[in-house]
A protein has these predicted regions:
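Sequence-specific dsDNA recognition surfaces
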Residues: 4-56, 187-244, 250-257, 265
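A short beta-sheet element
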Residues: 50-52, 56-105, 233-234, 238-294, ...
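A short glycine-rich beta-alpha junction/loop motif
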Residues: 79-83, 116-145, 263-268, 303-330
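Well-ordered mid-protein domain cores that form the structural environment of catalytic cofactors
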Residues: 104-112, 134
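Feature representing long, continuous alpha-helical segments
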Residues: 282-286, 291, 295, 330, ...
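Amphipathic heptad-repeat alpha-helical coiled-coil/stalk segments that mediate oligomerization
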Residues: 375-376
Length: 376
């Protein structure tokens, strides 16, 4: 038997004072990660006095460009922008089960198909509540949620490990910087790569400036190598660093530790490559993560007018940083490189777990996989 989404949940329509929020408890479409990646801390808070409220157990879904699949299960109370939908489970409905109903790719496909607008499509709130699902009893809801949660918990553990490794890398690098006896600029250590050579293969992977966030790359599908949008031109390779020219506060950057031979990136992503006798790729990436580097690049970028403040490589290249010659970098470079490889491996494992979860999810929701024998 089937039912509508409105039978198991409602939109939460409460408000909360912006003064009660901080960068951790405020959620907007900009700090929600694509492909069901959860959230990061917000770069800024809204200027309005009140915003939408959510509580622990709600499910938040970005209503702009639903195909980005931005969704988060609220782990605490907070507030969100009006472009984020807040779903609250009805009495008798398992909140985590509701989350997985909404995390199903078929829901995002439906939301995209019924969305309104072309340049910035938004999901239609009325149509969304008419989304058809299988009617599932409470015990089965809990079993489905438990199976899928086990995979998400492992993904969360990997994320926590990587966050710890990032802190270690930053601490180690800060200690080395304190021993530096000279200064250099980013431009003296790196090249701005402008490789627009065509990819010969019939299928390619396209990477937009907002697709990579804080070093996490999405699973990028293969698409036909034809009729590409004009901004998809740049080539990059293993060991390069990608850094968005737009809104650096949003942290759209990443260290490429995979074969990128079939990738094409947006021209809004700088491709930064370490100069071999000046710095290793892992060291250069750590330089670009320095708060003072981000702050200076952001200041230069946001001093320009426009809807989307945009910097350029010249802005980055002129930034001065502490420096010592390569012979003093050997030990720390090896350590940072190993940390980066470990982080990349954890990310890869999480991607595979997410693929397994997304394969199981529709089969569990439809009843194709029988969970009656599962013991909780």
């Amino acid at each position: 038997m089937r039912c509508e989404l409105s039978d198991i949940c409602v939109y939460r329509n409460e408000r909360i004072s912006t003064n009660a929020l901080n960068s951790h408890t405020y959620v907007s479409t900009e700090n929600m990660l694509p492909d069901k990646g959860g959230i990061t801390d917000a770069a800024s808070l809204p200027t309005v006095s009140q915003t939408s409220k959510f509580i622990y157990g709600d499910t938040l879904v970005s209503n702009i460009r639903p195909y980005f699949k931005k969704i988060w299960f609220a782990e605490y109370d907070g507030g969100c922008s009006n472009d984020v939908l807040v779903f609250s489970a009805k009495e008798g409905v398992d909140p985590k089960y509701l989350y997985y109903v909404l995390a199903n790719d078929s829901f995002f496909a439906y939301s995209t198909a019924t969305s309104k607008g072309t340049k910035m499509p938004r999901g239609d709130k009325t149509s969304i509540m008419q989304y058809q699902i299988e009617k599932v009893d409470s015990p089965t809801q809990k079993k489905i949620a438990a199976i899928l949660s086990a995979l998400d918990e492992k993904i969360a553990i990997n994320r926590e490990i990587n966050e710890n490794l990032e802190r270690q890398a930053a601490s180690i690098f800060a200690g080395w910087l304190n021993t530096c006896t000279d200064f250099s600029t980013i431009g003296d250590m790196a090249h701005n790569i402008l490789d627009y050579s065509p990819v010969a293969s019939e299928q390619i992977r396209l990477l937009n400036s907002s697709d990579v966030t804080e070093g996490v790359f999405p699973v990028v599908p293969l698409v036909p190598n034809k009729d590409l949008k004009g901004h998809f031109k740049k080539r990059f390779k293993f060991g390069d660093i990608l850094y968005s020219e737009i809104r650096p506060r949003n942290h759209h950057y990443g260290f490429v530790l995979f074969d990128a031979s079939d990738y094409i990136a947006s021209t809004r992503l700088m491709v930064i490559r370490a100069i071999e006798n000046k710095v290793s790729p892992a060291m250069l990436y750590q330089y670009l993560l320095l708060p003072e580097v981000e702050a200076e690049f952001t200041l230069k970028t946001e001093s320009r007018s426009g809807t989307f403040p945009q910097g350029n490589y010249a802005d980055m290249a002129s930034i001065r940083v502490p420096y010592s010659p390569t012979d003093s970098q050997v030990a720390i470079s090896e350590t940072l490189t190993q940390i980066r490889y470990t982080i990349a491996q954890n990310q890869l494992e999480s991607q595979r777990l997410a693929e397994l979860r997304d394969t199981l999810l529709p089969k569990l929701m439809s009843g194709e996989i029988d969970v009656s024998a599962v013991q909780l």
